[in-house]
């Protein structure tokens, strides 16, 4: 097994050991752009990184020079790596751009389980560019878009275009809540459409956006009349979450559900203009009938 050590200008990043002389020498020989801030990933044998109680190995330049002979050979253009002879063994050295990191490190930094990160890589849904170098998967953050993945989206929806004022009120309320919770909002999605219609293009695009980690909405019926728990479970399995601001309004509105269903059915039978009035009359008639039966 090998362990990956990352060297950046001025310091060596490793939780256990620092090898500035070794990594710096290798990076200087293998890459002419090391002075411009390039990184070098060096694969070392596991025994070289093991901790010893007496004197930790590979801590001083003298011990490094005594144990290791650095002779870069066999350049491999096009793959971004070269072979290095270290202590009689051939090891790979990978020179990467700034911002490159191991896929596991990227997953931990973005709050994603490593299993989900590998699954995204296999199905081609990883939201950042990645490349495989030997047995190592390196992730490159897009230039000019640092931290783009993992943003929060505010979702607001209305069933009728006559209530656009309420649509703006939803956006303002949810954004204020996110600001109070110190959650930066990276995207706002508004939509006008029936909660029973399952082919809402704007909402489906939001669900399929891998750069959105958290979706925040005022009430759960803004997502749809039914199926909230299913969508929440699917997003959770993908390392994402669905947040409802007004938890007090989570209780089912039976009258609202019936009105929505009747409106949808009346729109199919009689057209959209008369759908609302016919649905309201049907609900009122049902309420009167229920009152008479109670008497």
From Swiss-Prot:
The beginning of the lineage is: Bacteria, Bacillati, Actinomycetota, Actinomycetes, Mycobacteriales
The molecular function GO annotations come to: DNA binding; DNA strand exchange activity
What Pfam families does this protein map onto? Resolvase (PF00239)
Q: Which NCBIfam families match?
A: transpos_IS607 (NF033518)
The protein's name in its UniProt record: Uncharacterized protein Rv2886c
Catalytic-site annotation from UniProt: 159 (o-(5'-phospho-dna)-serine intermediate)
> Domain of life, per the record?
Bacteria
| Domain Resolvase/invertase-type recombinase catalytic positions | 151-290
Q: Please provide, in alphabetical order, the Gene Ontology terms of the cellular component aspect for this entry.
A: cytosol; plasma membrane
């Amino acid at each position: 097994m090998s362990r990956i050590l990352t060297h950046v200008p001025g310091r060596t990043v490793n939780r256990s050991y620092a090898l500035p002389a070794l990594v710096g020498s290798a990076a200087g020989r293998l890459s002419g752009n090391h002075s411009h801030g390039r990184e070098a990933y060096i694969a070392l044998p596991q025994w070289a990184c093991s901790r010893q109680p007496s004197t930790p190995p590979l801590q001083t330049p003298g011990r490094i020079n005594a144990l290791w002979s650095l002779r870069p050979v066999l350049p491999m253009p096009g793959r971004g790596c070269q072979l290095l002879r270290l202590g009689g063994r051939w090891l790979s050295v990978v020179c990467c751009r700034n911002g490159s990191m191991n896929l596991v490190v990227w997953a931990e930094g973005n709050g994603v389980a490593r299993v989900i990160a590998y699954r995204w890589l296999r199905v081609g849904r990883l939201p950042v560019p990645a490349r495989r170098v030997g047995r190592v998967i390196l992730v490159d953050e897009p230039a000019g878009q640092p931290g783009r993945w993992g943003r929060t989206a505010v979702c607001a929806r209305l069933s009728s275009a006559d209530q656009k004022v309420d649509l703006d009120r939803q956006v303002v309320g949810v954004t204020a809540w996110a600001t109070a919770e110190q959650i930066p909002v990276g995207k706002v999605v508004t939509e006008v459409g029936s909660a029973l219609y399952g082919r809402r293009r704007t909402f489906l695009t939001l669900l399929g956006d891998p750069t959105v980690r958290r979706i925040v909405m005022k009430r759960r019926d803004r997502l749809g009349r039914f199926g909230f728990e299913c969508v929440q479970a699917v997003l959770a399995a993908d390392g994402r979450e669905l947040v409802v601001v007004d938890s007090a309004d989570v209780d089912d509105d039976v009258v609202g559900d019936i009105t929505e269903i009747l409106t949808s059915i009346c729109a199919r039978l009689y057209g959209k203009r008369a759908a609302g009035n016919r649905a309201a009359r049907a609900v009122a008639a049902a309420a009167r009938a229920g009152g008479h039966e109670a008497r």
